[in-house]
A protein has these predicted regions:
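Short histidine-centered loop motifs in beta-beta connectors
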Residues: 28, 34-35, 70-95
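OB-fold (S1/OB) nucleic-acid-binding surfaces
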Residues: 58-72
Length: 171
């Protein structure tokens, strides 16, 4: 379990409207990032980490993308160079290690940039409700510290019988 601080990443679109395009989670450099959901790894960029100091955004960032069975994609950004453990075409399960986070050269320090999007939406953006605690779901509040937790029943929710058996054999 890790303490995560949620920060909205806004994008200024047409006519100045703002929309949430992702979530930022404070991390410690070198932390392992785990899959939020299972799916197919569709894209990996593993050698483009920014070396600019004290930056807020950079056009080159290491990331990976996972396609989910419901048609959504998750994008995980700011991995260390050569720090991603998975490859395109690989199936991942919830809770599987994906890679080592970087981003310590950013103004906000090391952090994960996480977004979920739907290609069939006009603006592609989508921020789902999260399990904020074992008793509560909803949208996280900006700059509030949340503790991550990974209950087995949630991790296994989308798994096939074969994946569940494999997962439980590691427990």
């Amino acid at each position: 379990n890790a303490g995560l601080r949620y920060d909205k990443h806004n994008f200024i679109g047409k006519e100045g409207e703002k929309r949430i395009t992702g979530l930022g989670f404070s991390t410690t450099a070198g932390d392992t990032i785990f899959a939020a959901r299972g799916g197919l790894v569709t894209e990996v960029v593993d050698n483009s980490a920014s070396t600019s100091e004290n930056t807020s955004f950079h056009s080159t960032e290491n990331y990976l993308e996972v396609f989910h069975k419901d048609g959504t994609f998750a994008r995980y950004k700011l991995f260390q160079n050569e720090g991603i453990f998975v490859s395109p075409g690989e199936e991942v399960i919830p809770g599987q290690p994906l890679g080592i986070i970087g981003g310590e050269n950013y103004k906000q320090g090391s952090h994960l940039r996480f977004s979920i999007y739907c290609p069939d939406r006009p603006d592609h953006s989508y921020v789902p409700d999260f399990y904020l605690s074992p008793e509560e779901t909803g949208k996280p509040e900006e700059r509030v510290m949340y503790k991550s937790w990974h209950p087995v029943e949630i991790i296994m929710k989308e798994m096939s019988k074969k994946e569940k058996k494999k997962f439980l054999s590691k427990e």
